Amino acid sequence: MGIGISSESKESAKRSKELEKKLQEDAERDARTVKLLLLGAGESGKSTIVKQMKIIHKNGYSEQECMEFKAVIYSNTLQSILAIVKAMATLEIDYVNPRSAEDQQQLCAMANTLEDGSMTPELAEIIKRLWRDPGVQACFERASEYQLNDSAAYYLNDLDRIAAPGYVPNEQDVLHSRVKTTGIIETQFSFKDLHFRMFDVGGQRSERKKWIHCFEGVTCIIFCAALSAYDMVLVEDEEVNRMHESLHLFNSICNHKYFATTSIVLFLNKKDLFQEKVTKVHLSICFPEYTGPNTFEDAGNYIKNQFLDLNLKKEDKEIYSHMTCATDTQNVKFVFDAVTDIIIKENLKDCGLF
């Protein structure tokens, strides 16, 4: 009988030890788990950052995964040229090529009958001819006056490759593809001995009510704002400037009671498009009080300070900001490395080790 009790207590002690070990492992894993929330207005580049995490930290996209984006890429390309030709009527811009009016009619007819996400050789030729028309190019230059995908020129300039038989999208094609995010998308990866759980939440107004579910236990917020959106209006409300909306949103996030102790990193994104645009469109279109030089550096710093000045607790809370180009893998890799170092430093500070 004594032997039975002894082996039972041994078994119990063993179970207890295993449970203790598991609890310790869970606690260590939790301590190394970083919950990252990607927030920002619609079309600020959040989903592109998520794609970059897959490329940088999860072995990228396989050929099969790239092929899954083919229909999206064709759909983005078609929607872009349709948006431009539709805007030509609104902006009263004429075609230069006599054949273009007929091409436009054919384009619209084919768009209505073709299966979504497909590209026939005939359709590709029509799109190429229209894209070459100087009137279409003039309309494209005024893209901030209507809604057009940022990737329009990327795909339309490369239509020969994209429409070729046997086309397989590459990672850059995937990064430029655009699908509106609805709901919450979670991506997990490991880096610098940390386990990241990154949450991408739809940025358009109708999606924002879902954010509240993500707020608990957030380690760090990455807020994305498109620098190039300073002369653009919202898709969901054409009375509202996109930059003003972004500032309003950042203000509510930055000073929210939920995030009093949360690290906040500001990604001033689409710096490549901003650099191109700022030479043509003065920043005063968005900030009438701005009288400085319309250079990338001066105008970019002014926008950055507009965001940073919204922080009501500057003495307690530092906002870290980076100029980014979400489609540039090396840039995102460099910036995310810096963000991870901030997270590690903040964690050490919380533990009293820094």
Curated annotation (Swiss-Prot):
Assigned protein family: Belongs to the G-alpha family. G(i/o/t/z) subfamily.
Known function: Guanine nucleotide-binding protein (G protein) alpha subunit playing a prominent role in bitter and sweet taste transduction as well as in umami (monosodium glutamate, monopotassium glutamate, and inosine monophosphate) taste transduction.
Region named G2 motif: 173-181
Record carries keyword GTP-binding: yes
Region (G4 motif): 265-272
Positions of the UniProt region annotated as G5 motif: 324-329
Known partners and oligomeric status: G proteins are composed of 3 units; alpha, beta and gamma, respectively GNAT3, GNB1 and GNG13 for Gustducin heterotrimer for bitter taste transduction. The alpha chain contains the guanine nucleotide binding site. Component of the TAS2R14-GNAT3 complex, consisting of TAS2R14, GNAT3, GNB1 and GNG2; within the complex interacts with TAS2R14; this complex plays a role in the perception of bitterness. Gustducin heterotrimer may also be composed of GNAT3, GNB3 and GNG13.
Record keywords: Cytoplasm, GTP-binding, Lipoprotein, Magnesium, Metal-binding, Myristate, Nucleotide-binding, Transducer
Single GO molecular function: G-protein beta/gamma-subunit complex binding
Tissues where the protein occurs: Expressed in epithelial cells of taste buds of the circumvallate, foliate and fungiform. Detected in various region of the respiratory track. Expressed also in spermatozoa.
Region (G1 motif): 35-48
Alphabetized SUPFAM superfamilies for the sequence: P-loop containing nucleoside triphosphate hydrolases (SSF52540), Transducin (alpha subunit), insertion domain (SSF47895)
Basic and acidic residues bias: start-end ranges: 8-26
Binding site for GTP: 40-47, 175-181, 200-204, 269-272, 326
Domain G-alpha, residue spans: 32-354
Region (G3 motif): 196-205
Up-regulation conditions: By bitter compounds denatonium, quinine, strychnine, nicotine, atropine, quinacrine and caffeic acid in presence of taste membranes.
Protein name according to UniProt: Guanine nucleotide-binding protein G(t) subunit alpha-3
Positions with a binding annotation for Mg(2+): 47, 181
Impact noted for substituting residue 352 to P: Loss of in vitro activation by denatonium due to disruption of interaction with taste receptors
Entry annotated with the keyword Amino-acid biosynthesis: no
InterPro entries linked to this entry: Gprotein_alpha_I, Gprotein_alpha_su, GproteinA_insert, P-loop_NTPase
A Gene Ontology term for the protein's cellular component: cytoplasm
Lipid attachment locations (N-myristoyl glycine): 2
UniProt source species: Bos taurus (Bovine)
PROSITE patterns (alphabetical): G_ALPHA
GO biological-process terms attached to the record: adenylate cyclase-modulating G protein-coupled receptor signaling pathway; detection of light stimulus involved in visual perception; phototransduction, visible light; sensory perception of bitter taste; sensory perception of sweet taste; sensory perception of umami taste
